[in-house]
Each structure stands twice: as C-alpha cells, then as structure tokens.
C-alpha cells in the first residue's frame, strides 16, 4: 500500500565547527573548508500526498517568500522525476532564520528525502545529492546523512566521526546578511588548506571562522553574544555567516555548565542547549 502522509519529519540544524575561506573561483563562489556537525535543534515537517499534482505549503506563520527553499525543493524533485503527484507541506519552524545554522537548507533536504519516500520514487542518495546542490551549497550535507568534512563550495563531503558533545547555542536578535559578509573587505580569502588529520588532533579548538571578523564589524550583538558565551564556557565561535554563536558545554550525559536562563538574555535572543548527533535522523531514508 502506498504512503498517504508522513508526519513529524525532522530537519536538524548544523554547526560549523570551523570555517576557512581558502580561495575564490572565477565565477565568484568562495572555496571553503569546514566541518559540519549535526545538532538536535530541528524543524519538524509534515507531508500529505495529493493526487492533483499541486504543491501547497500550509504555514500559519509569516507570509512565505516566493523563493521558499522547501517549495523549490519539492518542485525540483517533481519536475526531474516527472512525478504526477503533489503534496501538502507544513513546517513547525523552530530553528531561527538568519542564524548560520542551515535551517532552510535542512528543510529543503528533508523535503527531498520525504517526498522521495512519499511518492515512491526510490531515488538513490546520489541522485538526491545532485538535486540538493542545485538548491544551495549546504543542502547536500543534510541529504548526505552524516557529520562531514566539507570542501569546495559545499559539494565535496567526506563523512567523519565526531565524539558526542553538548553545545550551547545562542542566537542574537540580529540577522547578518550573507552577501554583506562575503563582500566585506575584512574577509580573509586565502586561509591555508588543512587536512582532516589536522582537525582530528584537536576537534574543538581547531581553526577559526573566517566570516566571524566581518560579522563582528557588522553587528555589536554578535560581539556581545560571543563574549557572553566565552565568559560562561571559556571559548566561543560563530556558526556559518551568523548570527548564531556556540560553545562546547561538555561530553557526558548532561552538560557540564547549563545554558543561561532566557530571562537573563537580551530581548528576542534565543539560547538552546543542543546535543550533537552522530547521524542524521533520516540517514536510512535513501540508499
């Protein structure tokens, strides 16, 4: 019997444990090295199959942008597979926008994985990865299913094992425009290439985030958030192009130092204690 619906489909966020800009291609895309680490801060998606071929998103929150990545993913898979089916899609959004946590990219990846199953397409992970790259540089990582060493513009993924850790993640109210950060004169674009063995020797303290200095110049709130975590956990770093920042909070069954209370944070800031994931919760949804 074919599936009629898929409910409570997770779309986990990620942290960039480091992010080095190692060059720039002739087409303007920046070349990166990073480790993407999955965390249990996640959106939740729901899908119901439609027979009329329509793709409809039913969110009661803010109006959806025309280029909504989730719908773009659904349309792309529908077109490339020539599938006559459609879907009603809704998202319980928990991962904040403009955070550098990959929330939108993860939603798109979970959409590809879910509709591949709901529509009975049986596409391989490799085919879905190729679609994901058309949607954005971070999407293939979430389709891939594992923590990864990431190179190129985000398309070269090497699965790696990461020790289970707790991460304190703090999202200030500001949204940092990615275009402004990559266009900043403060951005270093020639960081020396590293190796996985370099990272593995000291996974928590290795490297830096080349986007952090431009983001700090753009927003005092990023500076404040980094300082707040550093005072509590001893070190802090920004994820992606921001504005979320994070710090290691222990490796045991519970965090070594708890997350600060929401009442102690500036207005509209969001703090979350997150557990690192060893694999994506949908890792078995594609071959």
Curated annotation (Swiss-Prot):
**Catalytic machinery residues:** 14, 138
The catalytic activity, as recorded, is: 4-CDP-2-C-methyl-D-erythritol + ATP = 4-CDP-2-C-methyl-D-erythritol 2-phosphate + ADP + H(+)
What does the record give under GO molecular function?
4-(cytidine 5'-diphospho)-2-C-methyl-D-erythritol kinase activity; ATP binding
Report the EC code(s) recorded for this entry.
Answer: 2.7.1.148
GO:BP terms for this protein?
Answer: isopentenyl diphosphate biosynthetic process, methylerythritol 4-phosphate pathway; terpenoid biosynthetic process
Provide the function of this protein: Catalyzes the phosphorylation of the position 2 hydroxy group of 4-diphosphocytidyl-2C-methyl-D-erythritol.
UniProt name for this protein: 4-diphosphocytidyl-2-C-methyl-D-erythritol kinase
Q: Which organism is it from?
A: Methylibium petroleiphilum (strain ATCC BAA-1232 / LMG 22953 / PM1)
Q: Which gene encodes it?
A: ispE
